[in-house]
């Protein structure tokens, strides 16, 4: 009986040991599976994190490239605008210089023309002064000396004298002469200075009355002669 009980005990022990071993194996397998799951999860998390980092780095690279391209485009536009502004300013400066040169040339030409005209006038005046025309006295003398030649009338002499140039002294002397001219039709006497300037004669009241009487008589006779009233 004792032997049988010992066998039963050994069998129960072996069964309990087998159960414990199976439990331990199941626990180990569950632990291994949990470990494998955790490792796979960690690996997936790591992979996802690495992919997220790569995407972020790509986005950053794209942003940096965009910012660099925008900065380069802005710099190129600013450089082009600066070059255009500099070229426009240079063009304006060149135009201003060209206009100034034209103005200077025109001024120089005008000055040269004025100098030439002044020189020509001075030469003409000098020649006229050096070679004055003959006066009336010279014509009278020549006419008196040349008795055999044709005699010139007063009109011809005046025409010849008008054609000849006169000096300033001769002109002043001619204009300073005052003479009395009597109108043959009316009998009026006038004071004429030079070529035709009429002067007023200052007289007394009595002389003024006599002059008016003579003038009215002469005017009446001239009117009657024109009208044919006189015999």
Curated annotation (Swiss-Prot):
Record flagged with keyword Ubl conjugation: yes
Chain positions of cross-link Glycyl lysine isopeptide (Lys-Gly) (interchain with G-Cter in SUMO2): 193
UniProt keyword Ubl conjugation, yes or no: yes
Biased composition, class Low complexity, residue ranges: 64-89
Cross-referenced InterPro entries: Nucl_RNA-splicing_assoc_SR-25
Annotated Gene Ontology cellular component terms: nuclear speck; nucleolus
Localization in the cell: Nucleus, Nucleolus; Nucleus speckle
Gene Ontology terms, MF aspect: identical protein binding
Complex and partners: Interacts with ARL6. Interacts with ZCCHC17. Interacts with SRSF2.
Record function comment: Involved in modulating alternative pre-mRNA splicing with either 5' distal site activation or preferential use of 3' proximal site.
Name of this chain's protein: ADP-ribosylation factor-like protein 6-interacting protein 4
Organism of this sequence: Rattus norvegicus
């Amino acid at each position: 009986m004792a032997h049988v009980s010992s066998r039963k005990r050994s069998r129960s022990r072996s069964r309990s040991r087998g159960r414990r071993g199976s439990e331990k194996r199941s626990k180990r397998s569950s632990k291994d599976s949990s470990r494998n799951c955790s490792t796979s999860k960690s690996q997936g998390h790591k992979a996802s994190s690495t992919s997220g980092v790569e995407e972020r780095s790509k986005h950053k690279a794209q942003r940096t490239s965009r910012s660099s391209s925008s900065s380069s485009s802005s710099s190129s536009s600013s450089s082009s605008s600066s070059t255009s502004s500099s070229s426009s300013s240079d063009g304006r400066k060149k135009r201003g210089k060209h206009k100034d040169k034209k103005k200077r040339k025109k001024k120089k030409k005008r000055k040269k023309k004025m100098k030439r005209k002044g020189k020509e006038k001075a030469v003409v005046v000098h020649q006229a002064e050096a070679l004055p025309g003959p006066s009336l006295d010279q014509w009278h003398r020549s006419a008196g000396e040349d008795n055999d030649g044709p005699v010139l009338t007063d009109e011809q002499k005046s025409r010849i004298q008008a054609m000849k140039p006169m000096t300033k002294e001769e002109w002043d002397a001619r204009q300073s002469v005052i003479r009395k001219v009597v109108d043959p039709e009316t009998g009026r006497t006038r004071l004429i200075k030079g070529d035709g300037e009429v002067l007023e004669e200052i007289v007394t009241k009595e002389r003024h009355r006599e002059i008016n009487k003579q003038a009215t008589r002469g005017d009446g006779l001239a009117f009657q002669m024109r009208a044919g009233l006189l015999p």
